[in-house]
Amino acid sequence: MILALRNFWKWSLKRFNPNNRVGFLWLLTLFFWAKTLLAYFLDFGGLGASDPIQFFIMIINPFAVMIIVFSLSSFIKRKLPFYITAIVIDILLTLLLYVNCISYREMTSFVSVNQMLGYSKINQGLGGASISLMRIQDFFYWLDLVVITILLVIKKIKMQETPITKHNSILGLSLGILALFFNLFLADCSRPQLLTRGFDDTYMVKYMGINFYTIEDAVNTVQIDALRSSAKPNDISKVRSYVKSHYAKANSKYY
């Protein structure tokens, strides 16, 4: 038993050692997972979770998209582009999380893709209010990135020359996809038809995570824009005909 534990400990240190590429990606993943939970409970007010299943889903839902995204960076063979890409991905994910924290503090809502596209107008509207919306925990959203970058620069975390094998990259990507389907299964058990019915955005974030919510909102935005661009002036006649044929007269008992 002791020998088995010792071997497992050695395997863990080797696998999750930040001085190799796989360990470095896991380090970024775990830190971002911790930041996401910090946002869930401090900035998003627990997202209305009311039972152990919902809390469990909230705890695991950040992993799927993160594993998928970081696994994509593992296909990069060259040393410097790999580490730069991984850090940039982490910065973008952290920025997305932080912007949603600021938005939720001000408007109790999450940032949609349309709002991101019109960020300059929103920022002008907020003005100096953006600074007043900052909180003490904001420091922790960026701390890991600063520390990891410094450790890379001073070579306390060494950049590994040997690339991640294609087999391991595909394995990591498959693990992320499997985690996503598992998350979807649990979410559907707790809240049936989550993706097909028009629930509040809070439900989507609570069950699937902030990253999945943003992707889902982006897909919906593209579909709506495509429908708008393909709409023709004579389409309104079909709408009017449908409304006219399905018109229900007012009940004389009440009107």
PLM regions and their residue ranges:
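Soluble catalytic regions of membrane-associated enzymes that act on cell-envelope
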Residues: 207-255
